[in-house]
Amino acid sequence: MHRVLFLYVRRSSMIYDLSHTIAAIATATGESGVGIIRISGTEAYNIGEKIFRSKGKTRFKDFKDRTIHFGTIVDEKGREIDEALVLIMKRPHSYTAEDVLEIQCHGGRQSVSDILKLVLRSGARLARAGEFTQRAFMNGRIDLVQAEAVMDVIQAKSSKGLSTALSQLEGRLSGIVADMRTELTDFITRLEVTVDYPEEDLEDIVVHDLEKTMRCMMKRMEQMLKDSSKGRIIRDGMTVAIAGAPNAGKSSLLNYLLAEDRAIVTDIPGTTRDALEEWVSIQGIPFRLVDTAGIRETTDTVEAIGVTKARNYIETADTVLILKDRTQPFSDEDKALIKSVPDGKGAIVLTKSDLKPLLECRDLEVYGLPVFSLSSKTGDGINLLEEYLVSRSGESGTGENEVLLSNMRHIELMRQSLNALKRAEETMYVGMPTDLILVDLREAWELLGAVTGETVQDDMVGEIFSRFCLGK
């Protein structure tokens, strides 16, 4: 149990100085309606008292928690910089669990910049990227899963991605991991008792109970890892390469799916010479659509580079849509393109269904790929293609309340923890000493702790928060 306690308190003993008061601009750079400067730390209110003059009768030091006050920001010589609202959030009831002061001023570049400079001159230092969230983690208000979910909320590319991130921010994944660690802690403790007091003859009973619990835990881990592909797509999106010969309708399809004229469409073959990437949300799933250059033999140097890039996207994309103008005969080049698509990734899309066809869907079923017919002019058939893309993401089988692994760090740690449990199971099966079972159980316990940050290394924490934006 000493080891458990030591690892639990590691988070608050990491090499990180919480004594400094930090400040940063929390809104995007540029002109806007409102600009926000966030201050956190022991000197936050002393700084506020120096620079804020309230329009009300209450003195700054008498401001109550979770209140808003209107006034002006003044510099060291009493000169007014801007009108502002200040928000008071006293520890531990704030984002960082420290005293926090937020200044809301007009969103001009100069006003926000001048106020931040004044705050820094008054005793704060400029916050590093992600440092406010890092303090929330260090002060125990959130765990590492929740901290990473903050950035996922900000970067969500779709409604499903936002929902998954909010679920993790609320602590649902953390709760599952915590329950697993609690069960492992219980059995580690009970097994240690059998080692320390062998005369009690409890080992067979404890090992039998452990086997049943481990099987249930491993089954749940395996299911979560299986479903993690859905989580990854919801978080990071699915890449869809739109490929085909020149004038097959690739750019027209991209424009229809985006509901805007993003790509240039002409009757001139080779108009698209480089890959054009855009994000679109279909039924809440983020898709990264790549309109590639038309694939053909060419002596044009620039177009040839585009064709090479198109072939690279065909190799690496999650899904490849092979577009074919159904008013044109099927060629050897079309056959070669279909064969170049990795197994299980391709679908054939016959375009220009509003025109008199030379090809029917049944003509191409011999290639063993899904075949769709559509018109980017009328929209006919595109809903079926969208349903196909959603089904490719795996989202069609996801329950509303399902907790998904979406972060690669979490997925890898869960996989390693599962492997440690499998080794423990094998050790029990062959009748090895209890001490060896404990080695694998402790490793599984520690790896799960790294998910939530209880046993994570200091350098990993720093690396995670360095990905955040300033002011968060």
Segments from the language model and where they lie:
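Loop/turn-to-beta-strand initiation segments
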Residues: I285-F287, D318-T319, K345-G346
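Inter-motif core of Ras-like GTPase G domains
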Residues: I305-R326
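C-terminal-of-GTPase-core extension/linker across diverse P-loop GTPases
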Residues: L18-I25, T29, S159-I282, T298-D300, ...
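A glycine-rich (often HGG/GG-containing) alpha/beta subdomain
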Residues: H2-V4, R10-S163, S167, G171, ...
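Switch I (G2) and immediately adjacent beta-strands of P-loop GTPase domains
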Residues: G71-E80, V86-I88, T271-T298
